[in-house]
Every structure is written in structure tokens, then in C-alpha cells.
């Protein structure tokens, strides 16, 4: 996977979008991805990093255990298959901003057969401060810091923490 494999080099742009850092288990893994992105970019190349904005303590809705929630990755496919995704928080370390979840994906095929896959996952919701530090430590100059997808400046109340950074 992205943590273990070598990344090719010489790119003009690397995109780490759509909360992709949330899919990694720890701050150390997330910083590793920033470092690998730096190695993949040529000098002067750009890095786009996009995450939901959560500063300070782990948000209260990330601390509720035992509730199975339907995720946005659900819906109908072109062939008539139905996909439903669920997550249930099973463990929380609020001080270190870590959560473990039980994830389940169910696919009901047009003929009625259901295929299901369940797996465990750990997440570390990153803060803007962490990302800023990793960027600076890995030779990036932050060109812009946006707070949403329309390009509004980042504030403490922004829904997103989006960085546009240039490799020095």
C-alpha cells in the first residue's frame, strides 16, 4: 500500500484529497504520507491536502461508541445493485485523537444475493496544526490555506482545512 511501497518521483502535483489522511491509523502514518509526497514531487511541485477541520480535542460525535451509523458511501449502482456502508465506533482514545471502528459494506445484487464484508479500522482525525507542521518539516512552503471548497480563507470555524503547498 501507500505506506510500504516506494513512490515514483518527478511529479508536478500530488493530491491527498477527500480526507484520505483519515484512512490512516496514526499521526506517524499520516506524516509518512506527507514525507512520501515530498519525495514524489520535483522541486517546485505542488501538494494539495484536504481534510475535515477538527482542532483541539476529539470532536464529541467521534466519541460515541456502540452506535451503528449508515455512511454516505451508500446508494444504487447502474446495474441495479444496492450498496450500503456502515460504521460503529468501538474504542476511543480522546487524548490522542484515536478511534477504532467496525466497518461493514453490504452489496445486494439485482438477483437478490447479498455480499457483505466487515473489517476493523483505526483512524486519527488530523488537525490543521499537525498538517501544517508536517508540511513545514518536509520542505513545503504553504502557499494557501483554505477553509472550504469555494476558496474561502481558513478560520477557526471553517468546515475544511485545505492546504496548497509548494515543495521548496
Question: Would you name each region that the model predicts?
Answer:
Residues 12-29:
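A short SAM/SAH-binding and catalytic strip from SAM-dependent methyltransferases
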Residues 29-46:
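A short glycine-rich, Lys/Arg-flanked "PGG" loop and its adjoining helix->strand segment in the class I
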Residues 47-48, 142:
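A short hydrophobic/small-residue beta-strand
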Amino acid at each position: 500500500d501507500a505506506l510500504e511501497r516506494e513512490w515514483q518521483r518527478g511529479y508536478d502535483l500530488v493530491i491527498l484529497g477527500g480526507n484520505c489522511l483519515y484512512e490512516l491509523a496514526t499521526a506517524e502514518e499520516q506524516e509518512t504520507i506527507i514525507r512520501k509526497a515530498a519525495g514524489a514531487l520535483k522541486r517546485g511541485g505542488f501538494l494539495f491536502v484536504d481534510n475535515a477541520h477538527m482542532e483541539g480535542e476529539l470532536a464529541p460525535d467521534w466519541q460515541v461508541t456502540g452506535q451503528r451509523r449508515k455512511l454516505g458511501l451508500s446508494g444504487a449502482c447502474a446495474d441495479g445493485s444496492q450498496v450500503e456502508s456502515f460504521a460503529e465506533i468501538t474504542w476511543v482514545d480522546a487524548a490522542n485523537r484515536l478511534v477504532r471502528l467496525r466497518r461493514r459494506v453490504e452489496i445486494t445484487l439485482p438477483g437478490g444475493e447479498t455480499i457483505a464484508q466487515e473489517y476493523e479500522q483505526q483512524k486519527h482525525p488530523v488537525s490543521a496544526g499537525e498538517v501544517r507542521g508536517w508540511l513545514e518539516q518536509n520542505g513545503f512552503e504553504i502557499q494557501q490555506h483554505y477553509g472550504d471548497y469555494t476558496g474561502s480563507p481558513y478560520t477557526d470555524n471553517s468546515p475544511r482545512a485545505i492546504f496548497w503547498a509548494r515543495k521548496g
